[in-house]
């Protein structure tokens, strides 16, 4: 009996996980012992190379989010060690964005020539080296250099992971980018919470960040061998200037990240000034925004498959505009918190969908196209706070934020052409 059962299971054990478009199909084994066949299928699927590679790609997004989330709790400590005024701190924080923007075009070219794995490892190494320095340095010039290099590392790994995610999405023939970016959001939230918990328990900033760096480095070294060793394009392909479509998508990403930056930098100030919400709890608006953004990304692939990219972009843009109107114009706190929740939900799938859009165009290499839209998008986070502050000085904060929300009309009006063109 054992020999017979074993012989019937051999085809299942030998079968490749994704052969003939099916997972572990063996009718005879299933009829002979369905329970054992199920156990073998589960065990093999966990060990299957495709399963491991998929989770390795997902880990890259998680680690990138963890890196960014680890820096946020360090900001007030860096300010106090260096004795910085608010204006000096603002200039210091700009170094992160400039480092990212300068590194992204180079990362796009390196991804094409050296591969996603190479760029991910370089970016991860820079991140792991700079985070401990950001937790200990007290000189403004040294902090500026370290933060710029940290931004360069994060910008590089951002380009590589999006190119890699694009290739995986192409290979599987179904939407996957939103889920990948959901893990980025989850990594940022979990890392910030872990750092906050360690600091609350009395750990020094260096010890707290060392724990996070150890996690990042350990996971990076474990899954690096499973990352894609090449880029999405032919390394011998000539350099191509950004096409009109790529530039327009970049501008739309600029608007999306400007909106995200507005919620990050101005939501607490607005709630405190206009609704008299205490600053100690006004930051809850951004927490609600972040949670709904993560939830929207985890459901985004499912929605995109059923609704299509065009409807997802149109619906997302409308949700953001309605959310801004609720958050800014309505007085009861449940309603304006619901507004911030709608903003996060509407904005959640914008960047992942645009990554897929530029990956499908043929006017320039996908790696460079993603670097272009990411670089232009980062300008929204860099310039956004200053632009909103200037507009608030001229017309008022309420009106300035309403104008930011209205900018999402550009996404609604161009969605069909961008997603289909």
Question: Model segments located where?
Answer:
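Short amphipathic helix-loop junctions that connect adjacent transmembrane helices
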Residues: 73-86, 265-280
